[in-house]
Amino acid sequence: MSEIKEARLQKARSLVSKGFASYAQSFKVSNTTSFLLQEFDYLENGQEADFSVSVAGRVLAKRVMGKIAFFTISDQEGQIQLYLDKRIINLNLEKQKLLSFEDIKEIVDIGDWIGVYGTIKKTNKGELSIKVEKWEMLSKSLQPLPDKWHGLTDIEKRYRQRYLDLIVNPHSKNVFKTRAKCISFIRKWLDNRNFLEIETPILQSEAGGAEARPFITHHNTLDIPLYLRIATELHLKRMVVGGFEKVYEMGRIFRNEGISTRHNPEFTSVEIYEAYSDYFDMMNLTEELIKDVVADSCGSLIINYQNKEIDFSKPWLRISMKDIVKKYTGIDFDSFSGDFLAAKQAVKNINVDLSNKVNTMGRLLNEVFEQKVESKLIEPTFVIDYPVEISPLARPHFDNKEIVQRFELFIVGRELANAFSELIDPVDQRERMQLQQSLRDEGDLEAHCIDEDFLNALEIGMPPTGGLGIGIDRLIMLITNSASIRDVIPFPLLKPEITSKKSEKLPLNEVK
């Protein structure tokens, strides 16, 4: 055990020996730090307010100067200074069992959770403080916090021990506050437009609704394999078949894929479905929703993301995949008249890497887009009219069966949303699922399975419907100016930590 931990453990024992708890049962908080700082900002330097408060938080700083001491504590809302006068603290020791000024000075460390009772005072230097009358130890910290000046410089440790990151990095705490507010805003925005929130299964007998490799688990009692959902799409569409015309789900999605600054195997999305709508309606909804979220969170429709200015107020570009590929690469896919080999050679000439999976004109077009165009789309851009081969759940285009009524929204070179005019023809859907199943049988683990129950639902009849999915984590990255998706997920998945450190055991039943 480290010397610091042993010393702090001894202080906890000392508290118990004096008849005080080192880990309290509860504490009644009357006000948050932010409320006090706002409510009593009017006080003049040196002025006191006859207002009793009880506040709790973690000790972040400690300064003892003879018979007075200053502490800084932090709660969820902010920080406030505590002012301790030895005479006041020790005034009622004979009447009540309280911690003395000497106890506080000797036993309390940075990192401890404490609760105080007192009144409000603004110091002569102008800092609003709590003039402490009584002090309670709420939880004794046994390990020191990271140095407050250098913070938590090990980025991986910030993700692995998020609790430390939140303590020493106010920006991280603000990121997760913003995340919570954005999610709440989106829910209210949809609720106010009469969308109904639905909860669909996380454990599914078939993983469908996206091209992705699922996580597999097993149900012991039923003795069947189950999959963690890779999308909420197919179950939400079943709800539309059942008569719910406007539905959505905000929830966790699981995809057994790689980890990067843009990808986490467990992430949050919102999927939205509206009967009697198409992908043009979904474009309008997407633009309106995201503009409203950005304005509410940032106070402006012009934001800075990683030194790039993003203007959400201007009309968002809508352009087909073929046209934007031609714009950025000079390759006109219409000019090949279906000659796949000629198109493939043109693509190789601009150094696009091709796998064996890229075996159709549509997949070739998509590969060029992903490798040569996507990263260049900084301002909000709707890329529309995708190849049918990569869009098995989308409605065919009006006059071209090789493409579908689909769009993806790109901002700062990243996909943020994906939407279709939904395919509601059960015969067409079965044919596409059969093709997907054949690809899966050939080894493509991301291809769709045939979902007979979903096909049965379509045969019952589904109205024309527009569907949309928005990646919440990537949206929060934009709003909070975060470079990595790991910065906006409280506990991202990380590689196993390689360590030889043995677990330290504390003495049992000594500290209460």
Swiss-Prot record:
GO terms for biological process: lysyl-tRNA aminoacylation. The keyword Magnesium applies. Binds 3 Mg(2+) ions per subunit. Mg(2+) 1 binds at E408, E415. GO terms for molecular function: ATP binding; lysine-tRNA ligase activity; magnesium ion binding; tRNA binding. Keywords: Aminoacyl-tRNA synthetase, ATP-binding, Cytoplasm, Ligase, Magnesium, Metal-binding, Nucleotide-binding, Protein biosynthesis. It is found in: Cytoplasm. CDD domains: LysRS_core, LysRS_N. Mg(2+) 2 binds at E415. It catalyses: tRNA(Lys) + L-lysine + ATP = L-lysyl-tRNA(Lys) + AMP + diphosphate. GO terms for cellular component: cytosol. Its cofactor is Mg(2+). The keyword Aminoacyl-tRNA synthetase applies. It holds the Pfam family tRNA-synt_2. It is an enzyme of class 6 (ligase). Its EC number is 6.1.1.6. It comes from the Bacteria. Belongs to the class-II aminoacyl-tRNA synthetase family. Homodimer. PANTHER family: LYSINE--TRNA LIGASE, CHLOROPLASTIC_MITOCHONDRIAL, LYSYL-TRNA SYNTHETASE. This is Lysine--tRNA ligase.
